[in-house]
Amino acid sequence: GSIGRATKRALARAAAAQELSIKHRTARGKGLNGKFKPYSADYIEYRESKGRQTAPVNHHFTGRMLASIHWKANRNRAKLFFSSSAEKKKAARTHALRPWWGITDREQATINRIFSKELARVV
């Protein structure tokens, strides 16, 4: 019924907000534990040779990895995922070096607020 539709909508809005939050946080050079550690000297040299920025560290080279982050929701849950298996593997490697894929405490509070506010509109 309407509660199920409202729950799906609330989960969808929360998931969409978290997708943007991860992308914005990463673009600012921040992971789950604060500021990313710097690139290695060799990688800085490589990035410079390709005309890429070297600071802040933001996991952005071609843009494909972050662009492949999407979300889906149903009446029971929402999830964020990578639409490309190659980009998912790349994300796992970057996450191992500089944890970024997940939800910070602050982001969790935002998700809770969005979900509750959306659900309260119909209850």
Each predicted region: which residue ranges?
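Short, Lys/Arg-rich flexible segments
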Residues: 1-123
